[in-house]
Structure formats: structure tokens, C-alpha cells
Amino acid sequence: MPRTSTINDALADVIRQRRTDLGLSQEKLADNAGLHRNYVSGIERGAYNIGVSNLVAIAQALQTSASALLAQAEARSPPTTST
């Protein structure tokens, strides 16, 4: 699995990959999650920080859990370091 620059980018990649694996368009995912297609597009581009309630809605529409999406994103992002 390739690593991405931030957790937001990694989450965007995970959501996009899951959506395409399920054969869903952005519009269908948005409809199923009760969100606007432009918002889903922005999430997949990494343009938006996704809120918890929207992450849960997207996860349900993708037939998975928010925690599973986050775990996959965390595995793809570089470890954070504290200073």
C-alpha cells in the first residue's frame, strides 16, 4: 500500500478506492449518504476535512464502518511525531 502525505489524503484515497470497488459513482455515494456530490468530490480530492457524522454516513453508504476506513487511512499515512 502506498503511503500518502497526510491522514486526510489517505482517507480520501481509501474512500475513493472503496467507492470504485463497489462500482458507485460519486453521485450515487452522495445520494446514499445523504450528502451533496460536490462535497463527496471535495472529500475525495482532500479539499475538505470530513466531520465525524459525515464520515459515518459515508462509511454506511460504502457498507463498512468509519473505524475501518480510518484504520486503512492510518495504515497508508506516515506516522506522526510529537515535538
Task: Tell me the role of every PLM-derived stretch.
Residues 1-10, 79-80:
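A detector for short, charged/polar N-terminal pre-domain segments
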Residues 13-32:
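Short basic helix-loop element that most often maps to the first helix and adjoining turn
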Residues 15, 29-30, 40-43, 69:
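Conserved hydrophobic/aromatic packing and binding residues within compact polymer-binding modules
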Residues 34-48:
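Recognition helix of helix-turn-helix/homeodomain-like DNA-binding domains
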Residues 53-68:
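DNA major-groove recognition helix of helix-turn-helix/homeodomain DNA-binding modules
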Residues 70-83:
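Short, charged recognition helix plus adjacent turn
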